[in-house]
Regions:
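Gly/Gly-Pro- and Ser/Thr-rich, intrinsically disordered tail segments characteristic of DNA damage-repair
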Residues: 1-183
């Protein structure tokens, strides 16, 4: 968001382009993934897949000509004569750690630290089993997600399950693949 880009509408990869074309992409936005690009691929694989997608788009474009390019998914959906482009953002781990800490503090407003399991810089498990909130797990997740968005401007997703495995499956298989709602 600092760059003025909407992460839900921008084709973006986080990768250190200064290393080599074989560098691993640390993150890939959902819009790029929709073109069949792996979330943990190498930069050369992203470029190769974008070339393939653009060849496909060119073959179907009016006059078989691409008239420009865009990294904005909505523009690409509206105009089939645009080539798919993407932004390469260098990783900024100190910045990510700062945001991760801010988000962790939001979780602590609702859940005690001993019930928070940090899985990675951008993923945690919250055990809400013994909390006397007068709401469902889904409603509590919505409340926390809304707080994260309002406080940081970052969208969040939740997977809910009766154990860690089911929560992880709910996150990876279901939650990350459904359209975002207003909550």
């Amino acid at each position: 968001r600092e760059r003025g880009l909407d992460p839900l509408n921008t084709n973006l990869v986080v990768a250190d382009e200064s290393r080599t074309d074989k560098t691993i992409c640390l993150a890939v936005t959902p819009t790029l993934k929709s073109y069949g690009i792996s979330g943990r691929g190498r930069l050369f694989e992203v470029r190769q897949r974008v070339r393939e997608v653009n060849a496909w788009r060119q073959a179907r474009a009016p006059g078989r000509t691409l008239t420009g390019s865009s990294h904005q998914f909505s523009e690409l959906q509206r105009d089939p004569a645009l080539a798919v482009d993407f932004v390469i953002a260098p990783p900024r781990m100190a910045y990510y750690m700062e945001y991760s800490t801010r988000i962790y503090e939001i979780y602590r407003k609702y859940i005690a630290p001993e019930d928070i399991v940090v899985y990675s810089i951008d993923e945690v498990f919250l055990d809400v089993t013994d909390y006397p909130y007068d709401c469902t797990a889904h409603e509590l997740a919505q409340t926390i997600i809304r707080d994260v968005l309002e406080t940081t401007g970052i969208t969040a997703t939740a997977g809910i399950g009766t154990n860690l495995f089911l929560a992880k499956v709910a996150m990876d298989i279901v939650a990350k693949h459904i359209p975002a709602d207003e909550n």
